[in-house]
Curated annotation (Swiss-Prot):
GO cellular component: cytosolic small ribosomal subunit
Paired cysteines (S-S): none
Role: One of the primary rRNA binding proteins, it binds directly to 16S rRNA where it helps nucleate assembly of the platform of the 30S subunit by binding and bridging several RNA helices of the 16S rRNA.
Binding partners and assembly: Part of the 30S ribosomal subunit. Forms a bridge to the 50S subunit in the 70S ribosome, contacting the 23S rRNA.
Protein known as: Small ribosomal subunit protein uS15
Transcription in keyword set: no
Region feature (Disordered): 1-24
Biased composition (Basic and acidic residues): 1-21
GO MF annotations, alphabetized: rRNA binding; structural constituent of ribosome
HAMAP family noted in UniProt: Ribosomal_uS15_B (MF_01343_B)
Keywords: Ribonucleoprotein, Ribosomal protein, RNA-binding, rRNA-binding
InterPro entries found in the cross-reference section: Ribosomal_uS15, Ribosomal_uS15_bac-type, uS15_NS1_RNA-bd_sf
Family statement: Belongs to the universal ribosomal protein uS15 family.
Length: 89
């Protein structure tokens, strides 16, 4: 359950800090969040698909690590990002 290339490019364009930015924590977290949301919907409808569920857990862990890094390095960017993505209600 990967997101389409077009959708991924839209996310990158929206969250990029400068032209050609694909590796900043904001972009990586935004792409992972979209992927996690799709996998979450898949897991709700296919409850016995444990393989995809494990992939979902790995992506959540990766996003958690990136969020911790961003919080540690630049708290203001972290707060803006979680507000834009709607995380940490």
């Amino acid at each position: 359950m990967a997101i389409s290339q077009e959708r991924k490019n839209e996310i990158i364009k929206e969250y990029a800090r400068h032209e050609g930015d694909t590796g900043s924590p904001e972009v990586q977290i935004a792409v992972l969040t979209e992927d996690i949301n799709q996998l979450n919907e898949h897991a709700r409808t296919h409850k016995k698909d444990h393989h995809s569920y494990r992939g979902l857990m790995k992506k959540i862990g990766h996003r958690r690590n990136l969020l911790a890094y961003l919080r540690k390095t630049d708290i203001q960017r972290y707060r803006e990002l979680i507000q834009r993505l709607g995380l940490r209600r």
